[in-house]
């Protein structure tokens, strides 16, 4: 069988200079456009530092960023023209990403090169040089914490939106202004062997999977300042309007460092179903497996399978906060707000009717083969096994736990839960405080062993 030869389009042949000074946006886009016009091809980025604004990859194009090559985001807001997109659960106008794949199919973005977002400008714009100022401080003082992320509009590094048959492989992502990799409204996407690091800024999520189907994430190493890997499905009234779930998601064989762990939510409006998470190493993350939502999100999260997690120095191995971060989660126009407000403020503040439609449902979750260890004098030593709070009217239910060993500082708490089964679950604690239980029905508790005396004891109502 004769293999069809893949035509190559080297960006330096179109005028790109890898000197870290010359703006190469137009040259890179010309190479991509030429490959697309030829019916497809490989756009190659040789070694060098290529300063660029937003580029748009087209169907049947492979963008190959070679070893020693850096695509470096130019620090210029005008270089990222606004596009209609979903971001953080809302459809609105937002700066385009550095690399955009929108409405395309058969695209590969690969190589051993680096995508550098030069995010410090955007981080400082958001929260100042000391993380206490910037737009965040100004907005929070006015009761607008919920709006600041949506007004700052920091670019993502890679956006795959409304696409099918896309692969992202081998690259290193650093210093993202906002999320690193966003997979939205897409299907048949593979993300593998990425390294995501040097993301000290706010909301620098590693990989976000948003209202997408048949997505595989594997063999990635992620260190960031928010959720390492997150599955989302829209926010509040706008997310319920769109009503697109994330379904058939596989996350496996990844190593996660600093960050929020593996998260479902808080954008849950379209529903999240059939998610398989396995063979994950978590080292020093804030959370291990995390569920979060809010009273206006809605959606059903079900058929979730989690197995073979190994956590070291993780503060909250299991954090299920379904009324998460109210100052961010609930959009409310301030009293006395006069004059014109941004259109996306109105979208965010639109109430959910009837109100009970906004209460999410979490059910049918299996968690097995988990170990939690660590240095109890570590910075994350105030660890607790369970951080769980759902809703009195809609408890988190039908959770099956098996073959789990945790060594933590405290037992923690479980509020508003129903039908939890535990098989071979043992928790070793430093503090003798019992597991606090509130409004639980038919909920098994682990075997607890206090490290001070080695005796087993079980949780009590409190």
Segments and roles (model prediction):
Residues 1-462:
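Extracellular/periplasmic carbohydrate-active domains that bind, remodel
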